[in-house]
Structures are given as structure tokens and as C-alpha cells.
């Protein structure tokens, strides 16, 4: 970010110099060359730091207030062109396997420095302790996002929620899914918006992971698909985009969380 500011100042100074120089003079090549020299890396820096620029804008809008942040990881689990979703524990809907990251005790000092408060919406319990579902002062929003992106002082692995939601519940056999492999497809930032539910501005961040099953694990997933469970929904892309609705049905009772669309729309 500092380098980007330096490039911007250099570009502006070069353009001002050019505006006061005679294009027919040989010295004109100096400011024009400097403008190109500063302009190209500035463009590159803008592309690299686009996300941070967006967060800076959010911070300016909420400087004196707080932003509710939920930082999570969500799985894309696809078998024969259908996606595995599980019943939500708190809401009556189907959603991707996954959940919020947890912070480590080592981050307590940094969290205190940034004025981070725990979420005040959900009743805290042993399961939610350490969840990265927090309230951050707007003036520290960029610093918090940078801390999160560094991956220090917090959970970075995506295995815990997979095990809790699919293995510990008996939906998938423990002997086959003791270890799993996944690919990180990207990080989704939902544009900040005012949440009526939270009564505050809200920024949702989600890492999208794709399960890479072994042949034996794929067979177990197909067996799960062949034996319907009320805790599981195998949804097509169309049904996910319709938030659970199925074309042609008179009684639409299935609800799918919007987060499911993030897992199919993510681009690297």
C-alpha cells in the first residue's frame, strides 16, 4: 500500500512536469519516461491491492462505528454434478459443509490492540468459543483484514468442520475420512452491507475449498447419496441458484443458504 502511494505521487509529479514542458524539447523525454516508469507499477499495484482498496473504502464509511465480520471456510463437494449440502444447526436451511475459523490464544494481544469484540448475536458456548465471528472498529478494519490474510494466530486448516459435520455425525465412515485432501479455490469477500439481523454493517469472508476425494472416499460419498438422510441435500446447480426451489413443484419447502452459491461461483 505504501509503495502504491509512492507510485501515485511520482506519477502525479511526472505529469505536472510534463504539462509544463515543451514536447518538442529533448528534455520532455525525462518526465514522460518517469510517468511511464511510475504508471506501470502503479497499475500493477492497483490490481494487486484492489481488495485492500475496497476495504479502505469500507473503513472510511464505518470509521466511528463497528463492523460485524464472519470469517469462514466452505466446501465444494461435488459428486456426479450435484453438490453436497448439510442441514444447518442454527437455521432451517441447507448449506455447504464448513464454518467459521477459530482464533488462537496467541492472537489475544493483537485482538485487544485492534479493539476486537466477540459477536453479541449468538449465545456463546463451548462450541463457539474462539470463533472468528467478531465486531471490529471501522478504523481498524483494514488492519484486521490484513491480520486475517496473514494466517497468524488463527486456524488455517479446513478439516475440523468437515469432521464435525460429516464424520462425527456418522454420515461418512471415520476409517476412510480420517485424513482428507482439498484444494483452496479462492477467497470470497461478500460486499459489505447493512444487516437487519445484526443491526450493523457486516462483512462476510469465506475461503472456498474443494474436496479431493480418493477413489474409496468417492465411493463412500456415492453411498451417502444413494441412501437419503434428512441431514443431507444433494442439490443441482440450478436448485442452488434458486435458493432451494425446484422447477415444477407446487410446494417449495427446501431452503438453501446463499453461501452455497459462493462455492460454485468462485474463480481463482
Regions found by a protein language model. Name each.
Residues 1-268:
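N-terminal leader/linker segments that precede catalytic domains of diphosphate-processing enzymes
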